[in-house]
Amino acid sequence: MTSIRALVLVIVALSVQLVYSQVETILDSSEYDDLGLPTATELKPQIAGFLANDGTDLFPAVSMSNDGPSMAYQQRASVSNYANNPFIARAEQYRKAHSSSTRPQSISSQQQQQQQQQGYDPRDGTPYTRDIAVKQGILRGFVRVMHPQSGLKNVDQFLGIPYAEAPVGSRRFMPPSAPIPWNGLKMATKLSPVCPQNLPSLNNANNNYSKGRYDQIKRLLPYLKVESEDCLYLNLYVPSYDGIGPQTKYPVIVYIHGESYEWNSGNPYDGSILASYGQVIVVTLNFRLGILGFMKPGISDHTTSNFGLLDQIAALQWIKENIGAFGGDAKLVTVMGQGTGAACVNFLMVSPVAKGLFHRAILMSGSALSDWALTQHPLQSTMQVLQGLNCPLNGENDEVTACLRRKRYSEILGVKTASPQFSTRFGPIVDGLVIPNMPHKVMGQYSDIFSGYDLLYGMTELESYHILNAVALTYGLLENERDNLLRFYMQNRFEIRPDLALAATLREYTDIYMDPNKALADEHRDNLLEILSDARVAAPMVQTGLYLSKVNPKCYMYVFGHNSEAGEYGRLSQSVVGEDLAYVFGAPLGQVGPFQHHYNARERLFSEAVMKYFTNFAKTG
């Protein structure tokens, strides 16, 4: 396990970098006000749909209690008056000014009363759910019948529910709009297409992946084959109501998928076992990825971006308005993410646009403070794409966007752009609205923005395991190979004296970790993995927890320390990134999602414990 002394060193190094960061944020522009929001009036209608809300509780006053459990390093602190926060005040002004923005249409009272007796699919006998009335129309899903010996209750699945209008044609590179109502009954029994994406190659001729990583990706890819720009759908996994006694209001867990900002989907992650065991509603969703989801589609400071995050906000808005029809509690919504999904959740925690849409957060192996969480040079990425598509580099925003909309999405995905190691090509950016400022500034200076969220966060022990290829993981590294890779990382991470950061880090880690009984090549490899795991994931997550624990005592940290014994990493002494997901979704209790299917009795009990911890947090914080 990573030593505290080494972890503190990385935290200090990261803090120094934050102090001396030379990144010029959007807030320094005269075209944005002192709160980081655009002054241009033409942008206001575009964001109105996200700042408008049917009720007054989108930006509620925060009442915090200092009572409750806390970690050893947590401190009590008074919370600033929520109404005095400038970010929230400006967002509230927009919300009130545009309260007449289009909202999802309500269905008639006659439709709301239409409830059909449970039927069966005539093709295979699969039982249907009861009909559910949401604002857009009537939905019918199917029941997943659990094996009687499992001890699990049945789960109603509603798959492929549109939470926003399809972002095609003139809607491409635009914020999501409300979903279009439908007439009659909509069968919610099939997963939707995934959003357009460039999938990782399984060509392992150069041993790009370890055997374990290769097998993981191979299991995941079949879920991602059918894609379309019409992809803004979510899936609900709801404990079946047996009709006996009053129906319970279930807490809600919304899962934001990880792996990458450029590929993957919520579809592979079947929430049935987690929903049944924990008696919660589990929601998975798709959001726009890569260029279509995160590229800034223009060179003007006023260009709207972060469409992937706006999609997530739109999904949370749909959940808030409709989850009650499924027996869910709109006041008990937890958003959970892993990897890049965890960074997205953290961004939503500091976004005034997402206020009031969820109440608790679970961060797994990621943070908004991680060096990979933001695209640091979005304009460079945009210029490369425009050049590759022969779109005007110096045109007005409308001209550039029109050119991008004329292209087939396959052309857009096919553009070749530079992808240096340790950098993010197309991910969230500081836009002054969804992400109002650099996350460390928002969490440090405007902590009341995210103080209302309870937080559970944690990591595995080898978060950077997949950085190395199979050869390096098997045979280790030479000292100069380790140092060259670390030197390149430090140069990308620190603008001031990266050589000093490298020297101090190596001195600290080699002093702690040098093992005379281990081969030098293995030692150098393990040094590298420990340093990068701490610097890129562990230290940023601990810092996020420190920020929040100062204003909210319900802040809990865990370390996941188990690899499946029959899985890809069973021989390793430390847990590998992503190994926790199978236990959170209950894979040892039954076949769900893209996980291996060989678990022993002890691991089934362990999965039950993990699900209990996570769902208890969703229920009570």
Regions from the language model: what does each represent?
Residues 2-3, 14-110, 117-309, 330, ...:
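Non-catalytic accessory segments of hydrolases
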Residues 7-22, 221-397, 401, 406, ...:
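Serine-hydrolase-like catalytic core of hydrolytic proteins
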Residues 156, 229-232, 310-313, 317, ...:
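A structural signal for well-ordered alpha-helical segments within the folded catalytic domains
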Residues 211-213, 296, 359-364, 521-523, ...:
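Surface-exposed beta-strand-to-loop junctions
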Residues 301-304, 308, 371-374, 378, ...:
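Residue-level preference for long, well-ordered alpha-helices that form the structural scaffold
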Residues 323, 548, 618:
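Hydrophobic pocket-lining residues that define ligand/cofactor binding sites across diverse proteins
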Residues 351-355, 550, 587-590, 620:
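Short, well-ordered loop/turn and helix-capping segments at boundaries between secondary-structure elements
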Residues 406, 410-601, 613:
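Substrate-gating cap/lid region and adjacent catalytic-acid/histidine neighborhood
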